[in-house]
């Protein structure tokens, strides 16, 4: 299933924090403490393939997977949807294993095999007992290098993906965020959807699938990741055995050149009015930060200050942020969610609003943007400390299990080339001050162009110029 959801939980792509010193007089049957010795190791093979892992000697299971620096952004308008289509075909048989043999082999191990596609990455991974890791790596290499891509399988999956596309169109949040990308990055690779338009899904050919593999599944764009009870040296040996014949690089193409060009953020809006939908669903964003930007963590802290709100929760009046308190007091929204979505060279920082108070849509948007402009000049240390505490807690909670750790390693190595140490992450977050937040807001929010995506009963949403004007209006 493609990973299309853009809403960022506070820990998207962030890292674990190492534990303290191990007490040599550990009580019997205690859960083994990780200590400070656990670290991420990396090795690069001769063909450029990176192997990265975090070994936990007490873990009974491991997650291994291949993170590929290619997603829908690496496609053209004509081939949009190819990466996701390939993900569906991955488990439909290889030159060595039929689909039934593949499924039976995974089932007999009690393992889990999965894949997903995003705008910038394609990922294939497996979770299994430590002793079955070599079998899983063998299966992964077989899928990546020997998939048959039979015409019969392509036609079957074509129908499956078309039905999936119909289901996605029923999910308002997905629709709003897809349109947000489309308007913010108009006529650029990052503005395309992951599934692709239906006409592409109907027309994608085997040749296009093969060409996508040839142009993107190369060693310089791939990272073999391991997390759990698999030693790094063992993973390197398996990588050398199974992936040493991968081509080092791909031929330069117009699609590859375009995909690496930093996209322009375009202030604009897209509105789809449908009064049969009982709510107004609105996303507003400014240009955010990339994964490697110096302001990445400041952006996350600023996002946490704006916060989230859900009227249905029992603690709705007390969800921490000033905006959530104001929205609840005046009954302006059903929910809202702040987000900071990052890519390799750009990002989207904003808020997603849902309300059934259709005569107060303008008030909701106005006071949300008033909160944004407040951040430019009036942020207290107390709310910054609360946001930092939330962020650090969310980081740890998001890294529960080997699959989450593998995801973090793979994403970081693919996008930035290194995995930041846990101590470094904590130090950076702790160093963020109220002044840093205000500096970030003045640079990224104050009087900046915005992208707006709105779906549903949106008659009450004012015109773009009026909303854009709120980006430079004093909060006082």
From Swiss-Prot:
Zn(2+) binds at residues 84, 88, 164. GO terms for biological process: protein processing involved in protein targeting to mitochondrion. The active site is at residue 87. It is an enzyme of class 3 (hydrolase). GO terms for molecular function: metal ion binding; metalloendopeptidase activity. It catalyses: Release of N-terminal transit peptides from precursor proteins imported into the mitochondrion, typically with Arg in position P2. It is a peripheral membrane protein. It is found in: Mitochondrion matrix; Mitochondrion inner membrane. Its EC number is 3.4.24.64. Binds 1 zinc ion per subunit. One of its GO terms (cellular component) is mitochondrion. Its cofactor is Zn(2+). It holds the Pfam family Peptidase_M16. Residues 1-28 form a transit peptide. Binding to mpp is required for catalytic activity. Inhibited by metal chelator ethylenediaminetetraacetic acid (EDTA). Heterodimer of mpp (alpha) and pep (beta) subunits, forming the mitochondrial processing protease (MPP) in which mpp is involved in substrate recognition and binding and pep is the catalytic subunit. Component of the ubiquinol-cytochrome c oxidoreductase (cytochrome b-c1 complex, complex III, CIII), a multisubunit enzyme composed of 10 subunits. Belongs to the peptidase M16 family. Catalytic subunit of the essential mitochondrial processing protease (MPP), which cleaves the mitochondrial sequence off newly imported precursors proteins. Preferentially, cleaves after an arginine at position P2. This is Mitochondrial-processing peptidase subunit beta. It comes from Neurospora crassa (strain ATCC 24698 / 74-OR23-1A / CBS 708.71 / DSM 1257 / FGSC 987).
